[in-house]
């Protein structure tokens, strides 16, 4: 299988892990993984060399160089690695497909641009391809995003490019059925579809980095959120902080700290600013920049508890839920009650500190619910004893088995 993905360890982007987890497991099912990626010297994001330890030696990694970032009159035109590396990836893919025998080509998005080479490669070399959705390519803009701006341009471009990328795809996969339902309704495609969660490899979450110390204040109980902060999640973050403010007024909790890692988003009011506005700055520490994946795992292991705050949307798929269940002493969660993540919590009897979000619940009641759950969550005597056996069906090997069966069915049906 030829996997074309511009990010690969030591790149520290979120998208690395789904592709890595699948590639690592393919050999168990009789497949050889070749990953075609961009040389890390051309990656703008921070690098995490430790991540290379998590790549199976069975995975062949082929790297190409991307073109430099484009500027005009001192202004940055584009720097997206999927664009800068597109030609080099396509040319090397074409060469590999001519010289070797591959049975399938796989793209995982984002990056949004690499699947655009799928129709060309498939037609030219006769190899079927699939597109995997970790995030929706086309999505509904929030009221704050609407207007003549970059977000609207991005969505307009997505509406134009998505049909081109998937029109000849033999397989669509995704972390959520909701994502694929949207693709199908927009494009009226009849190709095979399969869903499987982000998944996890338990061993990833046990790696110790000896020279890293979590950013915890001495003498305080530390609770950690590590992940993104986006438009569809912003209302829930504010509600969480409002619930925390209410708790602080009734039951001072200055011996606690709530640390938010990787939540920088220039389009949104910062969590630091919201905490200041609510008068709870002493409780909230925001580290806007993402930190290396293995450092995050160490923070989660050593914290008094982990926090998962998600989207208002029902198709929300909490990839970070797995790492928190595997590593944390206890878990507070707040996201849509109809999401698959909620069902996973219930399966694992891990929902003691879960607050369900539903648009029918009033803001006042949500804040009260958060206050009550957080008060329970921070209680050292509160027992949280999840049953993790149900997670087995979501681990990386189980996911890869589901994926491989779908790929092999596609190949069989194509004859």
PLM ranges: what are they?
Residues 184, 199-218:
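Acidic anion/phosphate-binding donor-loop and adjacent secondary structure
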Residues 178, 198-199:
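Carbohydrate-associated surface elements
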Residues 262-263, 268-295:
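Nucleotide-activated donor-binding/catalytic signature segment of Leloir-type glycosyltransferases, i.e.
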Residues 35-97:
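A conserved catalytic-core segment of Leloir-type glycosyltransferases
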Residues 2, 215-235, 241, 399:
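Conserved donor-binding/catalytic core segment of Leloir-type glycosyltransferases
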Residues 357-368, 372-409:
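A charged, aromatic-enriched C-terminal amphipathic alpha-helix characteristic of glycosyltransferases
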Residues 87, 113-116, 120-124, 137-139, ...:
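Membrane-proximal helix-turn-helix segments that form the acceptor-binding/catalytic region
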Residues 1-60, 247, 408, 412-415:
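N-terminal subdomain of nucleotide-sugar transferases
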């Amino acid at each position: 299988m030829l996997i074309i993905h511009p990010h690969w360890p030591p790149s520290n982007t979120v998208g690395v892990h789904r592709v890595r987890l699948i590639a690592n497991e393919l050999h168990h099912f009789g497949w050889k993984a070749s990953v075609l990626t961009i040389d890390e010297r051309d990656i703008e994001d921070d690098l995490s060399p430790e991540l290379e330890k998590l790549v199976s030696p069975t995975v062949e990694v082929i790297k190409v160089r991307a073109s430099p970032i484009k500027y005009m009159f001192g202004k940055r035109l584009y720097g997206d690695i999927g664009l800068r590396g597109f030609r080099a990836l396509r040319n090397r893919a074409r060469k590999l497909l001519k010289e070797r025998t591959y049975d399938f080509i796989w793209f995982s998005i984002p990056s949004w641009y690499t699947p655009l080479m799928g129709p060309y490669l498939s037609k030219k070399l006769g190899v079927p391809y699939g597109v995997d959705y970790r995030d929706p390519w086309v999505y509904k803009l929030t009221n704050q995003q609407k207007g003549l701006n970059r977000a609207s341009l991005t969505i307009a471009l997505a509406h134009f490019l998505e049909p081109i990328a998937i029109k000849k795809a033999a397989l669509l996969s995704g972390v959520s059925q909701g994502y694929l339902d949207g693709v199908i309704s927009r494009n009226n495609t009849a190709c095979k579809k399969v869903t499987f969660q982000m998944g996890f490899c338990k061993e990833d979450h046990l790696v110790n980095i000896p020279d890293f110390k979590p950013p915890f204040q001495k003498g305080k109980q530390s609770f950690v959120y590590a992940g993104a902060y986006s438009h569809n999640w912003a209302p829930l973050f504010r509600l969480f902080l409002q619930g925390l403010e209410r708790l602080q007024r009734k039951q001072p909790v200055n011996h606690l700290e709530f640390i938010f890692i990787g939540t920088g988003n220039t389009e949104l009011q910062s969590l630091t600013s919201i905490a200041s506005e609510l008068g709870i700055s002493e409780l909230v520490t925001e580290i806007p920049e993402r930190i290396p994946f293995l450092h995050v795992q160490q923070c989660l292991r050593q914290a008094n508890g982990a926090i998962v705050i998600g989207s208002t949307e029902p198709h929300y798929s909490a990839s970070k839920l797995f790492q928190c269940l595997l590593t944390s002493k206890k878990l507070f969660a707040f996201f849509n009650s109809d999401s698959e993540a909620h069902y996973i919590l219930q399966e694992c009897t891990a929902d003691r500190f879960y607050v369900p979000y539903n648009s029918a619940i009033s803001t006042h009641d949500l804040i009260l619910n958060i206050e009550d759950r957080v008060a329970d969550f921070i209680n050292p005597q509160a027992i949280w004893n999840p049953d993790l056996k149900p997670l087995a069906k979501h681990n990386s090997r189980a996911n890869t088995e589901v994926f491989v069966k779908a790929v092999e069915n596609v190949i069989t049906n194509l004859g």
